[in-house]
């Protein structure tokens, strides 16, 4: 209830202002009645209206529940009643102002009360004006009776507790406002004590009010501090002025401030209605406000990037009320605002303000989007709450990070474990493969063991160790993996010497070298202990051939992966005094023994471990593996794949010691005593040569080196190790040492070096076959062989007596040496050794030229003249091939005489089991060369191992054949040696193109390559291109006989001997081969085809065929090719039947010959003539059908079909669609000759079927009679039906109207005065009549780029006029249409028409003629108006005033229902009503008794483009670039009713009005989703088309054209049986579709 002020002079209260707010449902109040005030939510000071006074409102009851109900103001149901007006005391008391903090008002009834306290005293808010100072209108004032008074003068209010405090108040207008009473200040004490004292003083809370009717959500007190943009009030009222549902925060919020905006500025207070109580929260949230506000200041300071809020008035400091608890006795009050976090206990009583809102960034944190809790408990705040929260968050974040790190570590460990397992699996697989390969190796018989090696062997070959001392140890890690009990020999005891405790081990099998162990051995050697304080635990000998070769070459032998054996005891630590012997870095501390899990390491892992093991600056860790890999490639063994060293740590000292201990083989005999000396020697030498990056250069030592002399001074400061022998328990005690490790192969290599020093040749035989590689081979042959990484160190072999090999040893004898029984050797790689021996170094012609002393050796040698090893003298590098000049030597007679005078060279001594072949020296040189060429791929060398057996057999067969040829009569040899006319040599190795003959007395030397050199060619292939040995021998006999006969009679031909020649080109080649024509066609080494004819004539041949007649075969005839060239080329010519290919080859030969600069040779002339003849031959047979191959005929037919149907392959599509339709329906037959001209396709989007053909193709391939048959069969097929439904949506005959004259021009010339009706482009209702000539001239005048800007020509009848029709009877035009292709049978009176034979002038079905200008935009603003921008900076000009002319015909169907049952021929079509008496005779076919019988008509049209005959078109007219004049959309006849229903068509209407909707792509897509099939296509000028019945179609003219169209009622439309198509017995085809071969494709 609001307080009312009274005027002292009048005694009546001032009339308040007019109330505002919603009105009651009763209507607007008047001055005589009560004025309804606003709702409880409106708190304006003028909303109070006192109750009217008068007799009608007299108070008669003394009960406060009923007496004052009629005198209360019409405020609302919650307003308490007033005392009756007849009591002046109460009225006087009512006039006094109420200043009590709480007021309790009685209820309106006995049961319902309103015990809520209302705040009646509060301060005026800043910025809000006070109430009006003017008195209200008296008409709105009704005096209220004063309330009952009490003893102290205050009005009586029942249920009021405590008693209100009253203060006299002056008049509202005259009395100044009273000062504001400040709230009581609480004593200075702690927060808890102040709260307890304040709680004890407070009166008990009133009971909770009932739930109000109008519920208004009240914001919580926190909203005034959350940066919402509304500042808190300057001063808060004391707690005593608050109710149980209010708090200081509420008063600071905007809603409570509006609720109390009626406070007067003079300090007087008025009673306000209570605010609506918000509904209690269903689930109150226990939320500490202070905890939320603790970090508010920090949050706002950090949010510097956000926009600052609008400036607001800063709140005044207010006294902090004592805190209270939610569980206190005064439970009706909400807790006051909490103490700020920085407020100390001593300052609790000081005036404080809520936290300053510097930024609104934390409002989203403090004020969530969800509903705020109604009541917030306020437990005692702690100063450390914010710190605890931060620490908790930090601990949580740290724990989360630790968890993530643990997960990452677990994943990393898992991946590492998987990688290790994968490596182990791969290692096991490789080890298994090595074991399987080793199991295949067999050892030689035991009885073939070599004798014991004597000590003098080492001194016999002092120059062997010029490069580098042998490696003093051999890795024995692969002993366990390679041992085989069944082939293992008995071990022999080892003498105790050198201070080492040696444990006898099993001999190793010869395994392929691995890359990793050489480095591991080198590292183990670098960190080898210097003192023998502890004996070695496991030292195993290495008796295999690899181990022996390794010592000789000075490299560590590759070993197999170590098995999982317990690690040996660690060796003693190295002493610092021995570190000066090797420039390596010692480990700072000894490493731990290796774990058992690391024992089974793969070779790749070991190689990776040895990459960076504290190397010395002078030691290279990359060079030895590279050389070893090349050496392994030489041996045909692929190197192991490289392995990353990421998971393979560097081997520790114990591992290196283990390698050294397990790989130290005791030397046999007395050589074991010098083991330590050899080791020391190797260390010194290794330290000097370790820093080389490329291949190691030889370091020269004294000329004669004694092993003992080397050992003594080096090891004098090192104690001699004592080697004690320890045998395995299971092995028998050997009686005497057996030289198991001495192998014949090792002895061969040692003797090879002896041969190199001893053997001297008078003059080396230099074969001139190797052009590209021979120079480098000879240059490097002089250098001493470097150490080979693939051979283990062998023990000194026994002295073997061998004879020097002569320089002229025969090739066949070398074969015999190589094929000696191999029981004398225990090597497991004998095929490799044999293969490596076969290559002999040669020099080039350029080398001989540089020397200036050509070799005068006979061109043809015998066995005893060949086989000598080449001289070690170097050869100069060859100059470029393009600048080579011919090397001339004496005549053959001189060579023959010199050969006869030359004494036979000494033969080789008998080869014993220990005598190696002298050609082993070539193998060592090859290894040296291969080490130099790092670009060679090891895969190419594996071909040697694969093809070795087959090539050796071929070599033996070739040797036998050569021996058979040598046994021939001497007469044949004399004939061959006679003088022949000078001609170019045709050798395979030396091309005569580079060395043409310049003299008749001298000829180019030719040396045929040895057959033993072929297996060594790296880029060779296994393909055989020659005959067998027996066949070659027989063929050679024929060739010799032919040559002898040719020498006597030059005219004799040997074509009959060589076999029949099929072509002139082959005949020419054979003539060149036999010597009739000179041809300089020779090939160089196929290994280097650049710059030779090898890559031109025979590009596919990478390996040369073997020669069976040796060198003399190519020398017999100067102008003939070698026999092997002849045979290989003859086979190629037989296989290659293409003449064009041979011509291309010969053209390339001629081009190459001209580039070299010898265009006048016989070869060039003959090649040019041959090319010309081949071209003539090809031209002669080009059009000869008798020689046509079936494939050629088929390809020609396919090309013709492709020409008919373009590149899209429409013939295949037509066959597929036609085959599909034939299987489903009974189609009319069509001849197979005509099917290739028919195209049947389906629209890719609409799936409707279209049939079409091209008339231009038809008239090119068919005659007049055939064309007539095709036209009738095509029309029958196009109108085919199934149960009365057409199968095709449209039929198109392209270019069929070209034979017709321009009908528009013909009408303008022949009927110029014919009146025609012309429409308008801008007004469809406007129709103009003019002569035909005028219209034609107007159209031609405005015709431009395919359209003319003139009105369309309406339909013009060509068969006469009826009623208001325009046109006439144009007989000539009708005759032209009848004679046009395809149109005769389907004219309205044609053979296929139901009314066949009627007169043309009586036809109601047409034809009609009309002209359309095409769609365009027609401007209407004239030519004077410019559309250009008026201002130069304007962005656009004015829009043109133009209108669109849509030249369209909406969807329609050329059919109607029968109008009369008695006369079936009387039907209403889309254009005319047809009535014919001539069809009455055929009425028996019609369905008279069927009232629902539908008659329909097909439509036929002819399109012609509008062209100006007098104008010259800029674009040239092409047949395939015809203008598109119509855009057609046709719907499948099966969907007739669906289309009519979807488009709301009325088929009984004319075509123009059947459908009012234009069908575009959007509608088409929608209809397609409903299953309606359609086809959208373009019709071009000079096209003809026909539309079967029941086909709804839509036309749009895109270019100016003239059209002639008519309706035709086909016979089968009126047949009750509904045949599949028209019957045409005279032109029908009785064949089925299976006669076409392409139909089933």
From Swiss-Prot:
Q: List the disulfide bonds.
A: none
GO molecular function annotation: histone H4K20 demethylase activity; metal ion binding
Extent of Polar residues compositional bias: 534-551, 985-998
List localization entries.
Answer: Nucleus; Chromosome
> Is the keyword Repressor assigned to this protein?
no
What the entry lists under PANTHER family is as follows: LYSINE-SPECIFIC DEMETHYLASE 9, ROUND SPERMATID BASIC PROTEIN 1
Task of the protein: Histone demethylase that specifically demethylates dimethylated 'Lys-20' of histone H4 (H4K20me2), thereby modulating the chromosome architecture. Promotes chromatin compaction by converting H4k20me2 to H4K20me1 leading to transcriptional repression. Required for X chromosome dosage compensation by enriching H4K20me1 on X chromosomes and thereby reducing X-linked gene transcription in hermaphrodites throughout development. X chromosome specificity is mediated by the recruitment through proteins of the condensin-like dosage compensation complex (DCC).
The protein here is known as Lysine-specific demethylase 9
Q: Report the source organism.
A: Caenorhabditis elegans
């Amino acid at each position: 209830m609001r307080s009312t002020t009274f005027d002292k002079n009048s005694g009546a209260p001032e009339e308040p202002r007019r109330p505002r707010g919603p009105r009651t449902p009763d209507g607007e109040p008047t001055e005589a009645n009560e004025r309804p005030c606003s709702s409880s939510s409106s708190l304006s000071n003028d909303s109070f209206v006192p109750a009217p006074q008068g007799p009608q409102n007299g108070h008669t009851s003394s009960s406060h529940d009923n007496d004052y109900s009629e005198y209360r103001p019409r405020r609302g149901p919650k307003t308490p009643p007033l005392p009756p007006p007849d009591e002046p005391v109460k009225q006087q008391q009512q006039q006094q102002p109420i200043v009590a903090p709480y007021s309790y008002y009685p209820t309106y009834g006995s049961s319902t009360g309103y015990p809520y306290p209302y705040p009646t005293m509060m301060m005026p808010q800043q910025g809000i004006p006070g109430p009006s100072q003017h008195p209200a209108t008296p008409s709105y004032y009704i005096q209220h009776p004063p309330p009952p008074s009490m003893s102290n003068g205050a009005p009586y209010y029942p249920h009021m507790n405590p008693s209100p405090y009253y203060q006299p108040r002056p008049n509202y207008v005259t009395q100044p406002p009273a000062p504001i009473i400040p709230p009581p200040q609480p004593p200075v004490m702690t927060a808890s004590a102040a709260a307890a004292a304040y709680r004890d003083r407070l009166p008990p809370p009133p009971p909770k009010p009932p739930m109000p009717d109008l519920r208004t959500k009240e914001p919580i007190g926190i909203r005034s501090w959350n940066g919402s943009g509304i500042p808190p009030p300057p001063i808060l009222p004391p707690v005593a002025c608050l109710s149980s549902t209010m708090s200081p925060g509420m008063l600071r919020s905007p809603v409570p401030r509006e609720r109390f905006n009626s406070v007067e500025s003079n300090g007087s207070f008025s009673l306000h209605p209570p605010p609506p109580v918000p509904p209690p929260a269903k689930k109150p949230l226990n939320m500490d406000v202070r905890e939320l506000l603790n970090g508010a200041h920090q949050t706002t300071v950090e949010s510097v990037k956000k926009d600052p809020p609008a400036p607001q008035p800063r709140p005044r400091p207010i006294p902090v009320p004592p805190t209270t608890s939610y569980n206190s006795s005064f439970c009706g009050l909400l807790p006051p605002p909490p103490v700020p976090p920085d407020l100390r206990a001593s300052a609790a009583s000081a005036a404080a303000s809520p936290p300053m809102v510097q930024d609104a960034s934390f409002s989203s944190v403090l004020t969530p989007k969800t509903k705020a809790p109604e009541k917030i408990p306020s437990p005692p705040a702690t100063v450390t709450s914010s710190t605890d929260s931060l620490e908790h968050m930090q601990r949580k974040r740290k724990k989360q990070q630790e968890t993530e790190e643990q997960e990452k570590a677990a994943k990393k460990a898992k991946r590492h474990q998987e990688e290790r397992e994968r490596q182990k699996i791969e290692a096991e697989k490789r080890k298994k493969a090595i074991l399987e390969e080793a199991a295949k190796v067999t050892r030689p018989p035991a009885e073939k063991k070599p004798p014991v090696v004597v000590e003098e062997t080492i001194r016999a070959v002092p120059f062997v160790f010029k490069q580098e001392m042998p490696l003093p140890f051999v890795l024995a890690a692969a002993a366990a993996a390679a041992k085989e009990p069944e082939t293992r020999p008995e071990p022999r005891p080892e003498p105790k010497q050198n201070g080492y405790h040696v444990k006898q081990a099993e001999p190793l099998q010869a395994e392929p070298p691995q890359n990793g162990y050489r480095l591991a051995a080198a590292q183990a050697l670098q960190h080898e202990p210097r003192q023998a304080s502890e004996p070695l635990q496991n030292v195993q000998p290495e008796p295999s051939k690899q181990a022996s070769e390794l010592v000789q070459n000075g490299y560590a032998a590759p070993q197999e992966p170590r098995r999982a054996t317990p690690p040996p005891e660690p060796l003693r630590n190295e002493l610092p005094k021995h570190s000066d012997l090797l420039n390596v870095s010692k480990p700072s501390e000894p490493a731990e023994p290796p774990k058992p899990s690391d024992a089974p390491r793969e070779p790749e892992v070991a190689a990776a471990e040895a990459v960076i093991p504290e190397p010395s600056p002078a030691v290279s860790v990359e060079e030895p593996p590279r050389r070893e890999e090349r050496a392994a490639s030489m041996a045909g063994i692929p190197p192991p794949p490289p392995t990353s060293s990421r998971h393979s740590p560097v081997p520790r000292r114990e591992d290196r010691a283990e390698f050294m201990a397990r790989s130290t083989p005791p030397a046999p005999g007395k050589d074991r005593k010098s083991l330590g000396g050899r080791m020391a020697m190797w260390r010194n030498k290794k330290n000097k040569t370790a820093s080389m990056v490329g291949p190691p250069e030889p370091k020269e030592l004294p000329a004669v080196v004694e092993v003992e002399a080397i050992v003594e001074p080096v090891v004098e400061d090192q104690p001699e190790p004592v080697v004690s022998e320890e045998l395995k328990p299971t092995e028998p005690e050997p009686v005497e040492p057996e030289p198991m490790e001495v192998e014949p192969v090792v002895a061969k290599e040692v003797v090879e070096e002896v041969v190199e020093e001893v053997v001297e040749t008078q003059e080396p035989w230099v074969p001139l076959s190797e052009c590209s590689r021979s120079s480098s081979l000879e240059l490097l042959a002089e250098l001493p062989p470097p150490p080979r990484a693939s051979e283990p160190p062998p023990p000194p072999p026994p002295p073997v007596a061998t004879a020097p090999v002569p320089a002229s040893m025969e090739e066949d004898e070398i074969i015999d040496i190589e094929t000696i029984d191999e029981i004398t050797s225990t090597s497991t790689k004998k095929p490799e050794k044999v293969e490596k021996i076969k290559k002999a170094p040669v020099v080039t012609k350029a080398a001989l030229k540089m020397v200036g002393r050509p070799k005068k050796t006979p061109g043809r040698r015998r066995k005893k003249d060949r086989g000598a090893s080449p001289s070690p003298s170097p050869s100069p590098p060859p100059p470029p091939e393009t600048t080579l000049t011919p090397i001339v030597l004496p005549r053959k007679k001189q060579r023959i005489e010199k050969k006869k005078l030359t004494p036979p060279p000494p033969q080789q001594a008998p080869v014993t089991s220990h005598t190696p072949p002298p050609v082993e020296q070539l193998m060592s040189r090859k290894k040296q060369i291969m080490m130099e060429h790092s670009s060679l791929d090891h895969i190419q060398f594996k071909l040697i191992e694969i093809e070795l057996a087959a090539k050796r057999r071929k070599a033996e067969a070739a040797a036998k054949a050569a021996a058979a040829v040598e046994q021939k009569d001497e007469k044949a040899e004399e004939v061959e040696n006679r003088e022949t006319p000078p001609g170019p040599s045709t050798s395979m190795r030396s091309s005569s193109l580079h060395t043409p003959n310049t003299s008749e007395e001298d000829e180019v030397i030719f040396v045929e390559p040895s057959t033993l050199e072929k297996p060594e060619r790296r880029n060779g292939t296994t393909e055989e291109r020659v005959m067998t040995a027996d066949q070659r021998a027989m063929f050679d006999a024929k060739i010799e006989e032919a040559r002898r006969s040719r020498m006597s009679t030059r005219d004799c031909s040997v074509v009959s001997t060589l076999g029949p020649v099929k072509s002139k080109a082959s005949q020419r080649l054979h003539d060149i081969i036999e010597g009739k024509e000179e041809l300089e066609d020779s090939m160089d080494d196929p290994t280097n085809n650049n710059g030779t004819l090898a890559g031109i004539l025979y590009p596919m041949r990478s390996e040369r065929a073997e020669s069976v007649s040796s060198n003399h075969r190519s020398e017999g005839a100067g102008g003939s090719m070698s026999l092997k060239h002849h045979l290989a080329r003859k086979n190629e010519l037989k296989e290659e039947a293409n003449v064009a290919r041979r011509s291309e080859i010969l053209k390339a030969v001629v081009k190459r010959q001209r580039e070299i600069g010898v265009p006048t040779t016989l070869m060039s002339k003959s090649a040019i003539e041959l090319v010309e003849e081949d071209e003539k031959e090809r031209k002669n047979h080009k059009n000869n059908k008798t020689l046509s191959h079936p494939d050629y005929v088929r390809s020609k037919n396919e090309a013709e079909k492709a020409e008919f149907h373009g590149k899209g392959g429409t013939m295949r599509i037509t066959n597929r669609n036609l085959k599909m339709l034939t299987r489903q329906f009974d189609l009319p037959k069509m001849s197979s000759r005509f099917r290739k001209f028919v195209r049947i396709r389906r629209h890719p989007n609409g799936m409707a079927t279209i049939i079409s053909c091209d008339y231009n193709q038809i008239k090119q391939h068919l005659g007049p009679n055939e064309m007539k048959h095709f036209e009738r069969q095509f029309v029958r097929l196009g109108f085919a039906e199934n149960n009365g439904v057409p199968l095709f949506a449209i039929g198109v005959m392209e270019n069929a109207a070209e034979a017709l004259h321009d009908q528009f021009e013909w009408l303008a010339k022949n009927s110029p005065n014919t009146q025609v009706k012309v429409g308008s482009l801008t007004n469809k209702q406007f129709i103009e009549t003019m002569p035909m000539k005028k219209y034609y001239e107007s159209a031609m005048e405005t015709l431009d780029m395919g359209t003319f800007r003139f009105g369309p020509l309406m339909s013009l009848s060509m068969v006469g006029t009826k009623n208001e029709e325009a046109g006439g009877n144009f007989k000539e035009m009708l005759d032209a249409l009848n004679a046009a292709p395809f149109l005769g049978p389907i004219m309205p009176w044609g053979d296929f028409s139901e009314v066949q034979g009627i007169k043309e002038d009586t036809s109601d079905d047409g034809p009609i003629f009309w002209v359309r200008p095409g769609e365009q935009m027609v401007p209407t603003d004239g030519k004077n108006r410019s559309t250009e921008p008026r201002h130069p900076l304007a962005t656009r000009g004015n829009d043109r005033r133009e209108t669109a002319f849509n030249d369209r015909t909406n969807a329609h169907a050329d059919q109607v229902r029968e109008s009369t049952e008695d006369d079936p021929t009387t039907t209403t079509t889309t254009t005319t009503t047809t009535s014919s008496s001539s069809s009455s005779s055929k009425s028996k076919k019609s369905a008279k008794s069927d009232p629902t019988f539908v008659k329909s008509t097909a439509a036929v049209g002819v399109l012609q483009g509008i062209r100006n005959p007098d104008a010259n078109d800029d674009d040239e007219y092409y047949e395939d670039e015809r203008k598109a004049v119509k855009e057609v959309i046709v719907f499948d006849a099966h969907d007739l009713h669906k289309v009519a229903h979807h488009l709301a068509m009325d088929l009984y209407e004319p075509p123009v009005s059947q459908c009012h909707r234009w069908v575009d792509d959007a509608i088409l897509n929608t209809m397609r989703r409903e299953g309606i099939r359609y086809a959208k296509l373009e019709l071009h000028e000079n096209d003809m088309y026909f539309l079967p019945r029941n086909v709804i179609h839509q036309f749009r003219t895109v270019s100016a054209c003239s059209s002639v169209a008519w309706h035709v009622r086909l016979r089968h439309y009126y047949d009750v049986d509904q045949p599949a198509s028209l019957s045409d017995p005279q032109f029908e085809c009785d064949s089925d579709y299976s006669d076409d071969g392409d139909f089933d494709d």
